[in-house]
């Protein structure tokens, strides 16, 4: 007698952190099958002090988690640019983006921007237009209103793709 494995879809939250706009996207993943659930962005007012903007990102993402109940989350890694102060502020937004799902007990994975692009488009230096075109193919029902929401969906897709490979490696003891 063989054991029957009942595979269930897993709900994944992708997050593209930013101080002006933090994109989020939710997909259900069942093996190679992806189903669009929702996407949007948290947009704190530019006039708020930094601490209040971070709080707005926290509260917005907490509402997304409450509304969509993801099982896992993925966040894009921060790239370092020439403006050190801007990089530090983006890092603070990214910290909040990682903290909120972790506070809800979720696994939080991190992916480099080039890996996200390579996974979704097939090229590590793809532009935002190419990502949005591939999203229409991979998630036909998705209609992200911002590039940040589209990027967040791409991050969720990347996690769906790579989590399976990581689980297979773990299963064989690699």
UniProtKB/Swiss-Prot annotation:
A cellular component term, taken from the record's GO annotations: Holliday junction resolvase complex
Manner of cofactor binding, per the entry note: Binds 2 Mg(2+) ion per subunit.
Subcellular location: Cytoplasm
EC number, as in UniProt: 3.1.21.10
Annotated Gene3D superfamilies: Ribonuclease H-like superfamily/Ribonuclease H
Major site of localization recorded for this protein: cytoplasm
Keywords: Cytoplasm, DNA damage, DNA recombination, DNA repair, DNA-binding, Endonuclease, Hydrolase, Magnesium, Metal-binding, Nuclease
GO aspect biological process, one term: DNA recombination
GO molecular function: crossover junction DNA endonuclease activity; DNA binding; magnesium ion binding
PANTHER family: CROSSOVER JUNCTION ENDODEOXYRIBONUCLEASE RUVC (PTHR30194:SF3)
HAMAP family, alphabetized: RuvC
Subunit record text: Homodimer which binds Holliday junction (HJ) DNA. The HJ becomes 2-fold symmetrical on binding to RuvC with unstacked arms; it has a different conformation from HJ DNA in complex with RuvA. In the full resolvosome a probable DNA-RuvA(4)-RuvB(12)-RuvC(2) complex forms which resolves the HJ.
Protein name, per record: Crossover junction endodeoxyribonuclease RuvC
Organism annotation: Rhodopseudomonas palustris (strain TIE-1)
């Amino acid at each position: 007698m063989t054991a029957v494995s009942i595979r269930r879809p897993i709900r994944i939250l992708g997050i593209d952190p930013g101080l002006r706009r933090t994109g989020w996207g939710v997909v259900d993943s069942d093996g190679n099958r992806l189903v669009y659930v929702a996407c949007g962005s948290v947009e704190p007012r530019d006039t708020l002090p930094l601490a209040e903007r971070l709080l707005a990102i926290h509260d917005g993402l907490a509402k997304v988690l409450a509304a969509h109940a993801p099982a896992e989350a993925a966040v894009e890694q921060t790239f370092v640019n020439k403006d050190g102060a801007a990089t530090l502020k983006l890092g603070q937004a990214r910290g909040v983006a990682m903290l909120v799902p972790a506070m809800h007990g979720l696994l939080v994975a991190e992916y480099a921007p080039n890996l996200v692009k390579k996974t979704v488009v097939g090229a590590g230096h793809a532009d935002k237009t190419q990502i949005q075109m591939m999203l229409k193919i991979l998630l036909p029902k998705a209609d992200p209103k911002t590039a940040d929401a589209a990027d967040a969906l791409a991050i969720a897709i990347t996690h769906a793709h790579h989590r399976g490979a990581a689980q297979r490696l773990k299963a064989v003891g690699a």
